[in-house]
Amino acid sequence: MNPINSLAFDLHSVKLADANSDTAALSNSNTPTMNNAALLQRPSSIMDSIGVQRVPSPFVPGSNAISGASTVPFNAYDAEITGSPLQISANQENNSAFSAASSNLHMNASSPSVLNKPSSTFPNVAPYLYNATGPAPNVGNQPPPPGIESQWKYIDSNGNIQGPFGTNNMSQWYQGGYFTPTLQICRLATSPEPFGVNDRFIRLGELTTLVNNYQDPFVAFDFIVIRALNAVPLVAPTSSEKQKVESRDLIPVADVHSDDFTYEEILGLKFEDGSYYHETQVWVPVDGRHITKVDRIPKISAYTAPLSTTSSRSNKTTSSHEEKVPSHEEASPEEQEVFSEEGRTVSNITNEEESIVKNPTKQEEESRGSEKEQNILDQVQPEIEEVDRKDVISTADEPKSKDTPQMTSEEQKRFAKAELMAQKLLEEQQRQEEEKKRREEQRKLKKEKKLKQKQKKEEEKLKKKKKEEGKLEKEKQKELLNNILTGDTETPSSENTATSITTNLAPWANKKPEGAVYNQISSALEDLKKENSSKKEKKPNRTQLDREQALKLQKEILSSAQIPKTQTGSAWGIKPQQPIKVDIKGELMKDSTKINSQSKINKANNGDIKPDSTFIEEQKKLWEQVQKKTKKFNRASSLDDFISRTPSPSSSALNSSNTSNAWTTVSSKSTTHIASTMPVAGNQSKSYISLDTLRSSGGLSTATKTKMSDKSKQIGSSTSIPTLKARQVKPSRIPAYPGNASVSKRQEFLRWCRSQLKLNTGVQPDNVLEMLLSLPPGSESKEIIADTIYSYSSTMDGRRFATDFIKKRLECEEEINDPLSWSEVLAMPEGSSEDWEFQVVGKKKGKRF
């Protein structure tokens, strides 16, 4: 027997295992089998232990059951999709399809399984499409199948469409865990596919159920598409709900993606919001005549219909119109043309009505009123009539159609709309008028509030002004009282100007006060006198003992006043041409009887001048007022210094009677008596004496001032400069002549003063020194000295000079022991030689000490 024929016979009689066979050799076989194949009844062969062949055998004839089972017709996919049972012919003569499919299957043996359902579900489908044990190994590591790679899009969490991306990228992201089953994905229509998911968003979970692959659905989808395009039998397991999917003809299309669509594609597009394109027909006139129809707008009188009636009427018309007018889609092309024209006219009408509604708001802003609206409507009316006339002509030319009742219903609808718009227009006008009134009322209220606020502000300003004026008046009154207190001592001398002789004032002190100031002072003095006379009970600040002492001091001063022998006039302005020589020694060595007789003569001479009791009482009252004011304003020292320099009528009379005598007699008795009885003023104020006060009282020397007395002598004159006299004279003994040493110390002090004084041009140092030496030597006169220096010098340091001046003056006055005053010392000559010393008669003539 030929061995080749025996081998062919063995291969032909191989027992083929069906799908339910338990043979181990065929359990993992991928060779397609058929359940309806006839099983051969023969004993087992050696081929049963080897296994089934895995490559097509060239010895198998075309009429074999294997080839018939392996060959699937091209329309198997379509038959399965439509739900019809798959009919596979047993004798199929197309071996090329089987060879191509088997070779393709063996090339992609490691690719993932398409479906995971068991083959028992689909008994008529080849079992190589299913894998009961799960997906094939290494399914995620294989590249996508060659030939076709799908393009996918997806919607991200923000609602944005991302993509398109290839199958490889989508597979990697899916395996990386970036995609969830609820992700919306869409496959672009690059090629036909059997599931009908092109250009449609589905969830990723739906795709996995379609391809029955949960590990890599994208690659599995591409495998299924390739099988379908290569005419490989492929059955997609579909559920009972999706078995009636419309089948599509599988037409090979080039893998070219473009955003340009054809007309048919545009009509088939559907967007996410459900919109789509559809065909419409629009009538375009050929003759070029453009006719627009405008509905007739009724007059204003027709607009007064209530809103309820118009709304009900419009509802009726719209309901009737809906019943009569067919839908736009069901209408014929001619009717669609009519509808398009009506749509244009309605849009024109609504635009015009909107413009009419908008006009009143602009007119309201421009505040032109409702009259202009009426004018606008009157202007629009002829245009509407012309349009209606043209419309009638055009309708007469056109043939009558069946849609005349529809046109009438449209007109009714337009009239209803016009009435509604008119009603809205009126309501808008009323609302705007109400807003106008409300705004005007608000403006009036705001204006009233502003006026009230302005009035309040003005009232507050007036109150403030009144308060300020009251304060200023009070300050002026205080200043007047202060001026009165400082100027009380000036009135007696001004009243007795007729009897006194005018003195020659210094050039810097020769300032005439204005008459208005004197008038104010005199009027204020009169008011004070009236008030003092009207007051019956007063509260004295001092005890009765102080009053008695003050009266005693005044009497003693009046009794101890002597006749001055100095020349009349002030020594401030002119320096004496001839030196004054005083025989101090002879005067000191006089007998006490002579001094007593001299005092008696003075008393006899002054006997005629007696103090008046009424004047003394007035002085007491004024003294009490002055003490009150000094405690409040702290002006005691300034008043004392001022009063001490005021001349009295008696002293002026004595000066007039002794103008020719140029010698001065120094009385030791009077000086000692004053020093013993006069109290020391301990509380001297530091207030500043004005220059006007100093100028008005700077006409007489201090020696003359201390000896003047009269009925009109001012208050406190007995206590002027008490410390100077107390320090100069010791009451315990009669002073003896100190010699030239005491006088030389005075001259040294004056020389130092002259060297330090750097005054302005025209100011004599002696005049300034005389004024400064008339002040008390204590620290209370420091500021007065400093102010005086500042007023007469632009280069000196007034405060420093004041401290040095007071210090040196106190040192000088502690060492000197003579009855001379500083004014007398200033009147002495000065020079480089010692001729300024006092000439005393001695043993040898011409000898100078």
Curated annotation (Swiss-Prot):
PANTHER family cross-referenced by the UniProt entry: FI03272P-RELATED, GRB10 INTERACTING GYF PROTEIN
Residues that bear Phosphothreonine: T350
Metal-binding in keyword set: no
Stated name of the protein: SMY2 homolog 2
Sequence similarity: Belongs to the SMY2/mpd2 family.
Pfam hit, one: GYF
Sequence segments annotated as region (Disordered): 305-505, 527-547, 593-612, 634-661
Keyword Cytoplasm: yes
Swiss-Prot/TrEMBL GO biological process terms: nuclear pore localization
Coiled coil: 410-484
Low complexity compositional bias, start-end: 308-318, 644-661
CDD domains: GYF (cd00072)
UniProt-listed PROSITE patterns: GYF
Biased composition (Basic residues): 444-455
Anything else known: Present with 830 molecules/cell in log phase SD medium.
Entry's localization field: Cytoplasm
Complexes and interactors: Interacts with ribosomes. Interacts with EAP1 and MSL5 (via the GYP domain).
SMART domains: GYF (SM00444)
Basic and acidic residues composition-biased segments: 319-331, 361-375, 387-403, 425-443, 456-479
One of the record's GO cellular component terms: cytosol
Protein keywords: Coiled coil, Cytoplasm, Phosphoprotein
